[in-house]
UniProtKB/Swiss-Prot annotation:
Keywords: ATP-binding, GTP-binding, Nucleotide-binding. Disulfide bonds: none annotated. This is Nucleotide-binding protein Sbal195_0713. Coiled coil: none annotated.
């Protein structure tokens, strides 16, 4: 069994690393308490040979000592690889300020800057135990993904991964899109009372939109545009391409168009994913 442990400071990219591992076929568990490592491996034995876990400051106290103890008790056939991700205090402060997420150590009387510094001190012993230390201060998510793949596979898989992401403009535009298409001008199922509670994943909505010549023409034009430029993007060593499709609420039109594009490109040589931001947020 192969076990990958990802640790590091909050905001340094642990979730990005876990997504890469998940794409590589690993069974991923986020923020697993260290004493449960052995139990997890025992439960997955025989069904999952690739396991990845992330640990962070919330699993303290004395995390480094607990980790050493847990690793010493791993089954002898376990092949272990460990990562520690870090970024400068300045970069972490900027990232948290941009996302407005709550830091794990933030309390009513502790500022964000103080929480970031405290976490760095608490995790310093952990950073000295790992196989691979990665400073992500100057890395974007694609650079970090490449580094993780390089370490695990011995080379960077340059197969282009295409992400089609639907979203609603009223909830804000995605920040990491390479291409963004506005489909708010297309016929809107929202005004059909029977379709209003449904989504672009539901057959009645799909049938409604498929009957609209304007919808089919626009999908074809996006497909043609991407097909034209994909070879040039691949020659530029791109690993990821994110195509964002936006409608008003991210429920009907953008979801349908993203799904249709994903189906068309799935027949090619690329890895293709369809993600629906607002639908996922509604489930959370």
């Amino acid at each position: 069994m192969k076990l990958v442990i990802v640790s590091g400071r909050s905001g340094s990219g642990k979730s990005v690393a876990l997504r890469v591992l998940e794409d590589l076929g690993y069974y991923c568990v986020d923020n697993l308490p260290l004493p449960l490592i052995g139990t997890l491996l025992e439960q997955l034995k025989g069904s999952n040979d690739l396991v990845a876990i992330s640990v962070d400051v919330r699993n303290l106290p004395e995390q480094d000592k607990v980790l050493v103890k847990q690793l010493a008790s791993l089954p002898p056939d376990t092949e272990l690889t460990s990562f520690f991700l870090n970024s400068s205090d300045k970069i972490l402060l900027k990232r948290y300020s941009e996302t407005r997420r709550l830091h794990p150590l933030s309390k009513s009387q502790v500022s964000l800057q103080e929480a970031i510094k405290l976490e760095g001190k608490l995790l310093e012993p952990m950073s000295k135990l790992v196989d691979h230390y990665i400073d992500t201060s100057n890395l974007n998510i694609y650079d970090l993904s490449d580094q993780v793949r390089q370490i695990l596979l011995g080379s960077v898989d340059k197969e282009l991964v295409i992400n089609f992401e639907s979203f609603g403009f009223k909830h804000g535009m995605p920040t990491e899109a390479d291409f963004m298409f506005d489909v708010r001008f297309l016929p809107n199922p929202h005004w059909e009372l029977a379709l209003r509670p449904l989504t672009g994943l539901d057959e009645p909505v799909a049938e409604f939109l498929n009957r609209q010549p304007l919808v089919n023409k626009f999908i074809w034009q996006i497909e043609n545009l991407l097909e034209t430029w994909l070879p040039h993007l691949e020659r530029n060593n791109r690993s990821y391409l994110t195509v964002a499709i936006g409608c008003t609420g991210g429920q009907h039109r953008s979801v349908y168009v993203a799904e249709q594009l994903a189906k068309r490109f799935s027949n090619g040589k690329h890895k293709v994913y369809a993600r629906h931001r607002e639908l996922n947020n509604a489930k959370a």
